[in-house]
């Protein structure tokens, strides 16, 4: 028996056809083939905006296409997620998905999206350092004094956050319930507006991510408490909520997602590029600046985490009786 061989002419023609087809196939399968839009649901200049821009730049170098940040501030951080409902699932539009994405549909009278069905979870990125700050000339030097004042003056003390349904808002209301105090929530569109209102005297305190850090170090604000499990490295003298007698930890984990129905291969490419970007020294330096840390999860793990978060946040919302 002789092994089967193509006639020489047929072999040459077949090889030529394959060579001609190869570039076409490669071109058809190239991803991404244009800039990627990254929707950020917070105002420009805040902690998340700065960090997302560093992440986008690092990812751009790996994807071979620009990752362009577009700010969609307001509505407690859900406008970017809402925008995904109108986008094609071709992998060229992503959004930062903060924890409020799991809360708002369970607080609203009519949910505009279902976070368990309407998104593709690409990669989990990080979480925040949160804390409560007051002006440096405020009368409260500790969080205990702040709480005592609130309890003695129900409904008269106010605080600002980046929006309704954010981790800052939810945790402050948890604290109020646990300590039997009543205070007034003042929502803003982002950290910049929040800080301006505090410095200008329109509000008495701010609960926010560590965008306040430089103002604290400059002596313009006083940090009363942090919400992390351990004390912040940059502020070792400031106690945690647990050390202050309140058994809470809040870090507001978040990641990146796209519209539902994305091509799994596109998800893989995006995940791999952003995973490398998360640990890129230029991005890690920004995380360090805001006392944050890498918190990577791949798509399957992040999707399971999202389902768990949705259930836990719903239980808390019902317990606190929160509505939009």
Where do the PLM segments sit?
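Hinge/capping helix and adjacent helix->loop/strand transition within the periplasmic-binding protein
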Residues: 86-92, 106-193, 253-286
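N-terminal secretory signal peptides and thylakoid transit peptides that target proteins
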Residues: 1-17
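Short coil/turn segments
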Residues: 43-45, 99-100, 135-140, 161-166, ...
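An extracytoplasmic/periplasmic, membrane-proximal ligand-sensing/linker region
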Residues: 33-35, 177-181, 264-324
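Ligand-binding pocket segment of bilobal, Venus flytrap-like solute-binding proteins
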Residues: 156-238
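N-terminal signal peptide c-region/cleavage motif recognized by signal peptidases
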Residues: 21-24
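C-terminal lobe and pocket-closing loops
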Residues: 212-279, 308-311
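N-terminal (or domain-start) structured segment
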Residues: 27-117, 156, 181-207, 215, ...
């Amino acid at each position: 028996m002789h092994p089967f061989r193509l006639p020489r002419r047929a072999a040459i023609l077949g090889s030529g056809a394959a060579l001609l087809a190869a570039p076409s196939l490669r071109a058809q399968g190239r991803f991404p083939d244009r800039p990627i839009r990254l929707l950020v649901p917070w105002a420009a200049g805040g902690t998340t905006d700065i960090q997302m821009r560093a992440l986008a730049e690092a990812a751009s170098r790996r994807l071979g296409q620009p990752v362009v940040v577009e700010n969609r501030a307001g509505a407690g951080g859900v406008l970017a997620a809402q925008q995904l409902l109108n986008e094609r699932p071709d992998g060229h539009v992503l959004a930062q998905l903060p924890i409020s994405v799991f809360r708002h549909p369970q607080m609203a009278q009519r949910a505009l999206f279902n976070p368990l069905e309407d998104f593709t979870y690409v990669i989990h990125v990080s979480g925040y350092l949160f804390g409560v700050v007051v002006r440096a000339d405020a009368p409260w030097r500790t969080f205990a004094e702040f709480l005592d004042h609130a309890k003695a003056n129900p409904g008269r003390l106010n605080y600002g956050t980046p929006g309704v349904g954010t981790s800052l808002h939810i945790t402050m209301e948890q604290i109020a319930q646990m300590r039997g105090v009543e205070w007034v929530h003042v929502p803003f569109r982002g950290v910049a507006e929040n800080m301006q209102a505090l410095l200008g005297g329109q509000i008495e305190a701010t609960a926010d991510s560590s965008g306040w850090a430089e103002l604290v170090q400059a002596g313009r604000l006083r940090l009363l408490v942090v919400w992390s499990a351990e004390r912040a490295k940059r502020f070792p003298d400031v106690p945690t909520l647990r050390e202050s007698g309140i058994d809470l930890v809040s870090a507001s984990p978040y990641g990146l997602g796209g519209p539902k129905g994305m091509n799994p291969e596109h998800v893989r490419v995006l995940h791999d590029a952003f995973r490398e970007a998360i640990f890129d020294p230029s991005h890690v330096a920004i995380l360090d600046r805001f006392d944050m840390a890498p918190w990577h999860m791949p798509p399957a793990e992040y999707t399971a985490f999202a389902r768990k978060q949705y259930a836990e946040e719903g239980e808390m919302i019902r317990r606190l009786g929160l509505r939009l």
